[in-house]
Amino acid sequence: MSAFTLYPAIDMRNGKCVRLVQGDYNKETIYGDSPYDMAELFEKEGAEWIHLVDLDGAKEGKRVNDRHVIEIAQKLNLKVEIGGGIRSENDVYEYLSAGVERVILGSSAVSNPPFVKKMLKQYGEKIAIGLDARNGFVSTEGWLETSTLKATELGKELANEGAEVFIFTDIATDGMLSGPNVKSTVELAKETGKSVIASGGVSSVADLEALARNEADGVSGAIIGKALYTNQFTLSEALERVKRK
């Protein structure tokens, strides 16, 4: 069994499963009324992990869809990682103590480094750093802001503070089904020497295989969203192929 992990994604907005194009809240497609039902479907297809995003939370800077997150973590046999709207120690504590496996800190890595460093010290690899980049520069606040900070620079800095897992999203490819940015993902893994999960742009099983070929360099998994919802391939197909690589 390959260690390369596939993370089916459920993006939640107003309690529903949605997809946005390049993080644009005006370009939303609803794919289901129940995040729990969707997660259960992925579990039946063989998922071990699920990647949840609280889009309302990312925009509002506080947890909004946490009820759905906790229900999935407690009732299904899935490891859950959650991002979006996690800004305080209490947010992190409540998710982890409710059975969530990993909490993703994104915007706060730029806006509140002391908080992120403290959480890394306290929880180690239960914390993933979400690095969302536009043209190589870190983007924050639900992708509404772009900073002057390079993703690789921030990655190296946080790796020195104890970050073990990064989730790298290239915003230009997200929701576009145009193929992931393999080059930038590998670059981040090499620069930090840590585990990097790729997010954004996966459109085919071949895309997943292209990422998985870089596992030795630290690319440890891929998040799949729109490709599953638009039936480009099934999760069970993808799991089977990546396992055989």
UniProtKB/Swiss-Prot annotation:
CDD domains according to UniProt: HisA (cd04732)
Active site (record annotation): D11 (proton acceptor), D132 (proton donor)
Keyword flag Metal-binding: no
Localization per Swiss-Prot or TrEMBL: Cytoplasm
An individual GO BP term: L-histidine biosynthetic process
InterPro entries associated with the record: Aldolase_TIM, His_biosynth, HisA_bact_arch, Isoase_HisA-like, Isoase_HisA-like_bact, RibuloseP-bd_barrel
A GO CC annotation given for this chain: cytoplasm
NCBIfam families hit by this protein: 1-(5-phosphoribosyl)-5-[(5-phosphoribosylamino)methylideneamino]imidazole-4-carboxamide isomerase
Similarity annotation: Belongs to the HisA/HisF family.
Name the record gives this protein: 1-(5-phosphoribosyl)-5-[(5-phosphoribosylamino)methylideneamino] imidazole-4-carboxamide isomerase
Organism name: Bacillus subtilis (strain 168)
Gene: hisA
